[in-house]
């Protein structure tokens, strides 16, 4: 997860020794900079195609296969390492869905996923137009 090896082990043990329960969070809602630098295709794009940069909250694209694979890998690694630790009382893998317009992405992956969802939901363009009230020809 980080280049600072052992810091989380020390933090968990320190809190456990003090008798505190820990809600373990994963860095999946805001992927770390080193991960975004290695895999820039995971970030969301705005309407003009500009990437949401590191330092903003929730800068990943929900539809990115790269992001989804890395989020699963990170979550599994943290769960395997700390899942049975007696100080861990709960897990938080994400929160605040939709805050700060962060659910919007105009990336290739997001557009493809939206089109796939439309096709699965409506089946045909005619059915989509009927459901959405699009009665104008183009």
Indicate residue ranges for each PLM-predicted region.
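Polysaccharide-binding and catalytic clefts of secreted carbohydrate-active enzymes
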Residues: 47-138
């Amino acid at each position: 997860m980080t280049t600072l090896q052992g810091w989380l082990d020390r933090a968990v043990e320190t809190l456990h020794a003090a008798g505190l329960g820990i809600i373990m969070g994963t860095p999946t809602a805001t992927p770390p900079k080193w991960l975004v630098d290695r895999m820039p295709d995971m970030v969301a794009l705005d309407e003009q195609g500009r990437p949401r940069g590191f330092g903003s909250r929730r800068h990943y694209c929900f539809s990115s296969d790269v992001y989804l694979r890395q989020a699963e890998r990170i979550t599994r690694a943290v769960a395997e390492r700390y899942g049975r630790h007696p100080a861990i009382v709960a897990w938080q893998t994400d929160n605040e869905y939709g805050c700060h317009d962060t659910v919007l992405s105009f990336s290739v992956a997001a557009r493809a996923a939206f089109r796939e969802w439309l096709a699965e939901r409506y089946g045909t363009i005619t059915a989509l137009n009927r459901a959405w009230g699009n009665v104008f020809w183009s």
